[in-house]
Amino acid sequence: MMQYSLKFNQAKVLVLGDVMLDRYWFGATNRISPEAPVPVVKVKDMEERAGGAANVAMNIASLNATVALHGLVGHDDAGCVLDMLLKNHHIQNHCITLDSHPTITKLRILSRHQQLLRLDFEESFHNVESSPLLAKLQQQITGYGALILSDYGKGTLAAVQQMIQIARQAKVPVLIDPKGTDFERYRGATLLTPNMAEFEAVVGACLNDNDIVSKGLKLINDLELSALLVTRSEKGMTLLRPNHPPFHLPTQAKEVYDVTGAGDTVISILATAIADGRPYEEACYLANAAAGIVVGKLGTSTVNATELENAIHHREETGFGIVTEERLKQFTKEAKNRGEKIVMTNGCFDILHPGHVSYLENARKLGDRLIVAVNCDQSVKRLKGESRPINSLSARMAILAGLASVDWVIAFEEDTPQRLISEILPDVLVKGGDYKPEQIVGCQEVWANGGNVKALNFEDGCSTTDVIKKIQAIR
């Protein structure tokens, strides 16, 4: 199988928001103070980490992408420590230093991996003049692939509408992790990433997925957004866009130790992938995988490219996702031994559209597990022409792996998957389109093994060619 590419060295992201320093004191707690009914912590270790918008920048730098940080800090020790942390990670620090305010600092005291107390040192920036921040943004935004506005409600983004307009004029996507219930202030942004509590506080209670979709699409329309990503804790995340099917991703977290900074990780991975030119679905797939990693760490943490790559490549250890042929054989054998019916289909799946989603959902209903075999890039070129594929193999596989209806995704380099089908021998072989069963590649092998072969129609009015024509017409 071709390796999934996670090189982001061409991506450039600008982060503007509430910059913080996170301090951690770790110690042992074995007794109660004689002075008051509180635990006594014997401090054994201390750490300092970039927090808030600075943590977003750290996550981006961990992916080897170019990142610049804009914000407000104080002329103090915490500001100096933060500057050193940023320089050590090759982050361009364009924060404005103020004599009138301290650097926002949060001190957490922990024992046995439990947070006992948090002390906040801060003053609101709401009364600080925004023009220097706006001038720096206007001057430096050209050439960046995405702008993140990291809002913790501390006042750095008091002029958020002007910031959005500067980015829009420069044709730079604006991604915002929102704060509070006044989402109107984010009007015109490209994408918002509220968590479920924040989302429901704005749109009202959602009883099911349909409520999330309908209310989310209305919010997109009302605020003139391009997309909305609702992070749903143990239920994963849902991407919504006008004229696109909802894209639901189940959580990939195995163990949750600390959710501190998880939202920072999601938006940083999302923006980096978008700045790298990757489709929204792939960007969400990567962000979801990264969130599953970071909640397994203690405190404000980042996810690096190696960890993310391992999570993508080794998701197959759980029995699902992008797999090698050897592992697929193992998983299908185990599934058959459990009495599960294996369904297999194949295609280029160049630009995923509602017709594809509906087709794959219907294919999955024919059995218990669905395999999607995907043509490699060279195979697509031979079949579709030199201008195809639009999306790379890694992007196409990542998007398919994120669909709830798909269990396993595998690439093949030949023009047809006949050899792969003969190795896997699914119980049901499915192909989309106006085929007769005897015309479907692999039918003889499947029939000889006692399996079934079916053709399913695509949804009317949905085709990759039509999507490409619409995109070309916009240009």
Curated annotation (Swiss-Prot):
Protein name, as recorded = Bifunctional protein HldE
Q: What does the record list as coiled-coil region(s)?
A: none
GO cellular component assignments: cytosol
Question: What does the UniProt function comment say about this protein?
Answer: Catalyzes the ADP transfer from ATP to D-glycero-beta-D-manno-heptose 1-phosphate, yielding ADP-D-glycero-beta-D-manno-heptose.
Q: What class of enzyme is it?
A: transferase
Please name the GO terms that the record assigns under molecular function: ATP binding; heptose 7-phosphate kinase activity; heptose-1-phosphate adenylyltransferase activity; phosphotransferase activity, alcohol group as acceptor
Residue ranges for the region (Ribokinase) are 1-318
What family is reported?
A: In the N-terminal section; belongs to the carbohydrate kinase PfkB family. In the C-terminal section; belongs to the cytidylyltransferase family.
The EC number on file is 2.7.1.167, 2.7.7.70
Q: Which CDD domains match?
A: RfaE_like
Q: How does it assemble?
A: Homodimer.
Annotated region (Cytidylyltransferase), positions in chain: 344-475
Its lineage reads: Bacteria, Pseudomonadati, Pseudomonadota, Gammaproteobacteria, Pasteurellales
The entry's active site is 264
Report residues binding ATP. Answer: 195-198
- Its Gene Ontology biological processes? ADP-L-glycero-beta-D-manno-heptose biosynthetic process
